[in-house]
């Protein structure tokens, strides 16, 4: 079960995440399109993104690979109004309870979802994160792939402190939108090592390809990350 603050946060940010032009140069898009070119599917490909906002990434995939069925599963129904293509099926739902049969999708995508799967406490949060990965494993067809993009913090101490400080702020209520400080934000970041370890346990290390790059943060983001150092990690997981 997710903390109530998660929906409140993303309801606040619907307009921000619906702005056009955010995904054309996304490294993850290149990774997915490269996979599709090499795979050479001869049938329609069933692609699903969890937390896809108004569907901009899915639309970019469709432009380059029109022979696909697209599903966007979102916890925020307001995104339905901003959907960028009528060819994208919008489903109100959660990665924790997706409601689809085993092996439904050829490709599954999640971007910066895992650190928002916050429960009522830290233990439940870790359970939610693992459960989401297990659901991805269940939903992907044999021969398919899972693409995970996640912002990580490279200090295990910082990840834990950020969680508890952000949880505390939901009680205190400090809200500075210009500095991306919200009373509705609780985050539980992975380190890149811990993310790879848990994915290896679930999917098998030999099935995972990892790309990572350091993220240069503006000073206020660096402070919010407690100077732990941030990375963008992209995992391609084959089944």
Regions found by a protein language model. Give the residues of each.
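Short, flexible/disordered intra-domain loops and linkers
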Residues: 119-129
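Short catalytic micro-motifs in class I SAM-dependent methyltransferases
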Residues: 112-116
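Core SAM-dependent methyltransferase catalytic element
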Residues: 202-204, 219-239
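Class I SAM-dependent methyltransferase SAM/SAH-binding core
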Residues: 48-50, 54-97
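C-terminal alpha-helical "lid/dimerization" subdomain adjacent to the S-adenosyl-L-methionine
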Residues: 147-218
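A conserved beta-strand element that flanks and buttresses the S-adenosyl-L-methionine
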Residues: 109
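A short glycine-rich, Lys/Arg-flanked "PGG" loop and its adjoining helix->strand segment in the class I
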Residues: 127-142
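Class I SAM-dependent methyltransferase Rossmann-like catalytic core
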Residues: 2-39
């Amino acid at each position: 079960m997710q903390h109530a603050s998660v929906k409140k946060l993303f309801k606040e940010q619907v307009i921000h995440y619906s702005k056009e032009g955010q995904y054309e140069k996304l490294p993850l898009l290149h990774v997915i399109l490269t996979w599709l070119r090499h795979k050479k599917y001869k049938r329609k490909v069933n692609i699903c993104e969890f937390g896809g906002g108004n569907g901009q990434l899915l639309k970019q995939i469709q432009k380059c690979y029109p022979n696909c069925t697209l599903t966007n599963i979102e916890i925020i129904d307001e995104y339905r109004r901003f959907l960028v293509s009528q060819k994208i099926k919008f489903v109100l739902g959660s990665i924790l309870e997706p409601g689809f049969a085993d092996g439904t999708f050829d490709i599954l995508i999640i971007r910066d979802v895992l650190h928002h799967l916050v429960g009522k406490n830290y233990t439940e949060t870790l359970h939610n994160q693992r459960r989401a990965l297990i659901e991805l494993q269940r939903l992907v067809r044999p021969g398919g792939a899972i693409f995970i993009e996640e912002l990580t913090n490279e200090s295990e101490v910082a990840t834990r402190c950020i969680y508890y400080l952000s949880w505390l702020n939901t009680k205190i209520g400090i809200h500075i939108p210009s500095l991306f400080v919200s009373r509705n934000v609780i985050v539980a970041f992975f380190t890149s090592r811990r993310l790879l370890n848990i994915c290896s346990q679930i999917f098998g290390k030999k099935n995972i390809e990892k790309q990572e790059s350091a993220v240069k943060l503006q000073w206020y983001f660096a402070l919010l990350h407690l100077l732990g150092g941030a990375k963008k990690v992209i995992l391609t997981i084959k089944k």
